[in-house]
């Protein structure tokens, strides 16, 4: 019984942890910038828990 409960908890833990905003930015082919986004890039979210901007290309 105890092993079964441990197995259920181990399956639930990775699904409960949300993906960080930095990982989400990198998956969308963005780069993190603490200043303004460079030319030909637009801000589309945050990085480093809201401390930086996620800059992605226009196209």
Curated annotation (Swiss-Prot):
Subcellular location: Secreted; Cytoplasmic granule
GO molecular function: CCR6 chemokine receptor binding
Pfam families referenced in this protein's UniProt entry, alphabetically: Defensin_beta (PF00711)
GO BP annotations, alphabetical order: defense response to Gram-negative bacterium; defense response to Gram-positive bacterium; innate immune response in mucosa
Signal peptide: 1-18
Gene Ontology CC annotation, any one: extracellular space
SS bond list: 25-54, 32-47, 37-55
Domain of life: Eukaryota
Keywords tagged on the record: Antibiotic, Antimicrobial, Defensin, Disulfide bond, Secreted, Signal
Job description of the protein: Has bactericidal activity.
The protein's name in its UniProt record: Gallinacin-14
Organism: Gallus gallus (Chicken)
Encoding gene per record: GAL14
């Amino acid at each position: 019984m105890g092993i079964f409960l441990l197995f259920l908890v181990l399956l639930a833990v990775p699904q409960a942890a949300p993906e960080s905003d930095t990982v989400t930015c990198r998956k969308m082919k963005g780069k993190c910038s603490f200043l303004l986004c460079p030319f030909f890039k637009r801000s589309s979210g945050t990085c480093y828990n809201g401390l930086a901007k996620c800059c992605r290309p226009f196209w």
